[in-house]
Amino acid sequence: MAHVLILHGFTSHPILTLGPLPEVLRRAGYSVSQPTLPGHGTRPEDLVGVRWEDWYRVALEAYRSLPEPRALVTLSMGALLGAKLAAEEGTSAFVAMVPALGFVNPLAPLAPYLRWVVPTFKGTNAVRDPQRKKNNPNYPYFPTSAFVEVLKLRRQIPPLLPRITAPALVLQAQHDSTIPQAAVRRYYELLGSSSKEYKVYDSEHDLLLDAKADEVAQDVNAWLKRVLPPTQSP
């Protein structure tokens, strides 16, 4: 059986923001693991004092616990952690949804300095569909100090991407108000994979919460089944 590790994003609810994807993959026959990264799934204040190394430690432990063959399916900040895992641990298939290699907010690069005077940032309700927007489970705000850790992690990723050679799928949101489209494209172009695909959806940043969530989940499942069938053995 093939195993899939799903990594959620920064401020994301570890279960709810993954939408239909985990269940779609399970029904297809994959073994699915979806760890909760430290500081998530509770309240924004629990991100205070959490370092990027803490997120990576949890992701690494969860990944190493999975038998091969194994795939990485990642979202936003999770695509930074996933890239580090894929480059350093290897993987059979790699999916990166709206990877957080840059940020639309012009204040984002200033977070290391702003944290002393601006303790929190407002979260982005990155869902276009009005009804789904009302039920967004992500944190409404987050500690600036925690975002600084995201920036520290992000700086490490560009040199790692050429080391990833597994089949890769990168998904972009056409109306993303969080991650610039150019940053997602750069992530894709830096990947060392000889077999890689790039898809764009009529969606906001939260691909698995917005109106295209079902389509995204089905597309990820179909792609995985091509490159790593659920019944594949080591």
Residue ranges of model-derived segments:
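Short, surface-exposed "cap/lid" segments of acyl-processing enzymes
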Residues: 1-43
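Gly/Ala-rich beta-loop-alpha elbow adjacent to hydrolase catalytic centers
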Residues: 74-82
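Active-site nucleophile elbow and catalytic-triad environment of alpha/beta-hydrolase enzymes
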Residues: 143-160
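Short beta-strand/loop motif that positions the catalytic acidic residue
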Residues: 164, 170-172, 176
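Short alpha-helix in the alpha/beta-hydrolase fold that links the catalytic acid
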Residues: 166, 180-189
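Acidic catalytic loop of the alpha/beta-hydrolase fold
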Residues: 175-179, 206
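Catalytic histidine-centered segment of alpha/beta-hydrolase-like enzymes
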Residues: 203-214
